[in-house]
Amino acid sequence: MQALVNRLWYDRQAGVHWLLVLLLLPLSGLFYLLTSLRRQLFRLGLKASARLDVPVIVVGNITVGGSGKTPTVIYLIELLRRNGYRPGVISRGYGVEFSGCKRVIAGMPANEVGDEPAMIVARTQVPMVIGSDRVAAGKALMDWQAVDVIISDDGLQHYRLKRDIEILVLDGKRRFGNGLLLPAGPLREGRWRQGRVDFTLVNGEGSGPEEFEMALAPGNWRSVADGQVVTANVDKSHESVAIAGIGNPQRFFDTLSEIGVQPSGQHAFDDHQAYSLEAIETVAAGRGVLMTEKDAVKCREFAKSNWWYLPVDAKIAPEFEQQLLTLLKRRENVQQGN
């Protein structure tokens, strides 16, 4: 199913699949009307929005699927800490059923808090609260920890929470796909939305004017079971299979090729896939397993000794850092009435 959707949205040579796109256009029109109405209700104050007592940085995208938001959030946490801030993070907690707000503590299973929150906290130990209501999550976070700036992960379309800085993350290769709104295309909002954000980060090739190029730099292979750095050659003459349950699995497979790792097979799972030992062993068929860090947080409890994950770090131009920090200070002064 995911392969078909990718062809519909991103393959310009999809041929007959464009017939299906045409059939979906009326639904995209309805989606446009509903989302436009919702935005206008917030803009006119007919739907309530709220501002928190600390600056809010929203990281998001306008397309469905992976673009590099999670590495960007981790990058921002580290950047803010280096510059004397005490950041916290709020997120939805995709795929997890709970009411109200929930604190994310390092070591909590991904099936209780979501794979991306589990990964962010495991990597950074940042204070984090998840909840469908970002305003409530932000207030719960401030009640819990003395944070002085909040990062809202994947919160671009959550207009109930007023924000001070918006950062759009784009996949450089896919960009806006066929340029159509859901479900005929991958867009949550029109391309016009890019012009309203403060910064656009382009993950990979193809950054344009007023865009900052971002690269995901692979780190050292680590054991899924205990997180220890692996010094041995994980490829072992093609005796491994690569798996990925992320928004854009091909990006992970391409990264392996770029660093000279050539597994004997690869398998793309759905984004936010709930893994089991049986499911992975069926794909692995006795071979070692290579996976992303996001996959690893869901497999740690039953991982085997020959399962490894590859962490990545976002690398962004220094000009972005300086412009972001300058804008943050300016927005802080406005909020404090200086």
Swiss-Prot record:
A GO biological process held by the record: lipopolysaccharide core region biosynthetic process
Catalytic activity: a lipid A disaccharide + ATP = a lipid IVA + ADP + H(+)
A Pfam family reported for this protein in Swiss-Prot or TrEMBL: LpxK
Pathway: Glycolipid biosynthesis; lipid IV(A) biosynthesis; lipid IV(A) from (3R)-3-hydroxytetradecanoyl-[acyl-carrier-protein] and UDP-N-acetyl-alpha-D-glucosamine: step 6/6
EC number: 2.7.1.130
Keyword Transport part of the UniProt annotation: no
Family: Belongs to the LpxK family.
Physiological role: Transfers the gamma-phosphate of ATP to the 4'-position of a tetraacyldisaccharide 1-phosphate intermediate (termed DS-1-P) to form tetraacyldisaccharide 1,4'-bis-phosphate (lipid IVA).
Protein's name in the database: Tetraacyldisaccharide 4'-kinase
Taxonomy of the source species: Bacteria, Pseudomonadati, Pseudomonadota, Gammaproteobacteria, Alteromonadales
Gene from which this protein is expressed: lpxK
